[in-house]
Amino acid sequence: MHIRTMALVLFAGAGQLLAQAALQPAQTTVPTLEEVRKTMGIPSQGDVRGQQDAVGFASKPEQMARVWELSITPPLPEKLGEAPPPGVAGVICPHDDYIFAGRVYRQVLPLVTAKTVVLVGVFHRYRRFGSHDVLVFDSYKAWRTPDGDVPVAGIREEMLALLPKGDFVRDNAAHDSEHSLEALVYWLRHMRPDLQIVPVIVPAMGFARMQELAGRLASVLAQEVTRHRWQFGRDVAVVISSDAVHYGADFNYTPYGDGGVDAYVKACEQDRSLLRGPLAGPVTTAKVEQFFSTCVNPEQPSEYRLTWCGRFSIPFGMLLLERTNAALGLPTPIGHPIAYGTSISLPELPVRDVGLGQTAQANLYHFVGYPAVAFTVGE
């Protein structure tokens, strides 16, 4: 999702709507928790995280029920391959407005059936928080959803106790400012009421640092999986949040011209090539690095090459999956591209009558891609 509610512009201090995928200027003062909560659709309270976006995402049970009901109605998103059976080890799912992306969410999230889900999200505003080269966790005990609160799994504290202190920070304001995980949690909770989560958002970092952090988090996650006698897919899964290309002048990304049919076709084909290329088949370090280097300048990771907002969440999440499975003595995870859509490829879900809407324009000069990938434990 690329523009939140009007209140978010308070961070920018200039009154200008900023696309989330666009490069954001550095901010001298880190937003306070109080400032961030003023931008939330439903502010966090006490030990429970609230909701950043109450326009593009469901905030009431009847809204979530309607989205769920309608998201399986035709026309369906473009099919890239056969979906594996439910019980997958991980997925990549978009996080744009339900009105645009709901049908793509529905193609991939029901494949996740585990009770415990490690959520790997985008940190869109990492520059404003001065965050880089660390993993960002929260301290909340639960997250609010339309269907009821979701507890944070106890393994979060167990894992953080084992990680080097320099590998992570805990920042509730950062998580309150971010929408990329809440969008997915609401679907997961709707499908499984006993869901528990471990949320983490990933700011900018180089690939070498990413490998270090993923390796150490994988090691402690594998310890917890072993201690609890869990199985990947059955009991625990990794869910990665990311939209695909953000095309248009607002995103500072117009390699095929300002927009129009030809630019749209070329941008979508570029997305498909990534989904069928480094995101497909056995997960290897070389393929993960290929994706990383396609999206960012490896020498200056904050510089976009291709505007996938999950330029850090996807490679980190894939490395986490691969290294956790290796630590458990399991086969290499296999990527299965399932579906692809964009903010203009399908009709809107008819949910405006229950209070859902859009947070940004969607047209041939301003569009966002939606990837759907599942990961299974290979044979």
Language-model features and meaning:
Residues 5-16:
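Bacterial N-terminal signal peptides
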